[in-house]
Amino acid sequence: MKPTVAIVGRPNVGKSTLFNRILNKRVAIVDDVPGVTRDRNFSEAEWCGKQFSLIDTGGYSRTGDTFSAAVLEQSLIALQEANIIILVVDLRTGITDIDLEITELLRKQASEKTVFLAVNKVDNNLMESDAQLFRKLGLSEPYFVSALDGRGVAELLDAVIAHIPEDDAPESDDTVKLTVIGRPNVGKSSFVNAILGQNRQIVTDIPGTTRDAVDSRFKRNGQDFLLIDTAGLRRKAKVDDNIELFSALRTEKAIERCDVAIILLDATQGLENQDLKVINAAAQKKRGMVIAVNKWDLIEKDDKTAIAYEKRLREELRNLSYVPLLFISALTKQRIYKAIDIAYQVWQNRRMKIDTSRLNNLMLNDIKRTPPSSKSGKEIKIKYLTQLATEPPLFGLFAGNPQLIEEHYKRFLERKLREHFGFEGTPIELKFRRK
């Protein structure tokens, strides 16, 4: 298991900037507004060959509002999960009452953990004399850094990895990568929390309360999963500041990273245009998909309600008939684990490799019974098939005049492939080559 390093501190001291500097990429949302990192942001990091998980927490604050209380809870969970803690303070503001509170919190909650003090915004050697003030906090020897330009960060990381033992057993790459997507307030974070069994994300009834995408690992039936929750896709007209824009881009990146997208819909509102955009985003990236209709507990129903609801959805999503659909409630946990099990099956389907002889025995019989035709009258003869790739499954079909094969016949071939081999939840690609 990789050790976990948590970055903590009050709002706007530069925690997310340090997080991004360590990763050498922009992962956490960084803005001048205090409290922008409202949730814990996870990522895998490496320094000098040693790997660790890095957590960027929301800023510790005591303003008394709902979000500050929730962020405090998240920070406490991060302290429990972490093996090593980096406390970030701000040279420009000096030691504040909140810095003292956090220091006391660390003494009580993390007395057995390794704590590093990073004095941020120390932009040159002359400023280091002022930074000596932070020794009064009574923590470890302070490290003077500038997260913005990288000054001193290497020395800090050298000290951090000195406390990380050599990794004897590297993690398996055979991990199912899932992402939970949907428009705002369909219950994505509630779903993640229900699966993980802890309040890993800030959840309120306000749309958009999950700003950053968050990675979480869990096991089910011996299988490793990586679960990525996202900020939700928004209509472009509503992305009216740089924070929301970057969150929307993060959602698209999360789709790129995943194997299977669990797409949440709101049972109380039906299918909306924004839902279609979310679904199309996953389909265009050729990802596996599972549609989970959430808040099913709020629907008045009889024994025919689910059948009628699914029929209506299927009519609106005709091109995605291969995508499994189920009804869930993140609040009551109804069928949430079934959603994970179906996603696992979709993951397996994406990796399925069909033997060439079996493929041709079944498919060439179908092609013989229903041969392709062209408007030009030229003969189109498909001679054989082979699977070229997986994730998603890609099939090569070798034929004479392949450019004349029409779209309706391509759909026929895809339908037959699914009838014979399944491939539920995953797109199939066909590539025609001249023979």
Swiss-Prot record:
Binding sites annotated in the UniProt record for GTP 1: 9-16, 56-60, 120-123
UniProt KW GTP-binding keyword: yes
GO terms classed as biological process: ribosome biogenesis
List of residues binding GTP 2: 182-189, 229-233, 294-297
Family annotation (InterPro entries): AAA+_ATPase, G_ENGA, GTP-bd, GTPase_Der, KH_dom-like, KH_dom-like_a/b, P-loop_NTPase, Small_GTP-bd
Domain EngA-type G span(s) in chain numbering: 3-168, 176-351
KH-like domain boundaries: 352-435
The entry's keywords: GTP-binding, Nucleotide-binding, Repeat, Ribosome biogenesis
GO MF annotations, alphabetized: ATP hydrolysis activity; GTP binding; ribosome binding
Pfam families: KH_dom-like, MMR_HSR1
Oligomeric and partner information: Associates with the 50S ribosomal subunit.
Function, as annotated: GTPase that plays an essential role in the late steps of ribosome biogenesis.
Family that this chain belongs to: Belongs to the TRAFAC class TrmE-Era-EngA-EngB-Septin-like GTPase superfamily. EngA (Der) GTPase family.
Protein name per UniProt: GTPase Der
GN (gene name): der
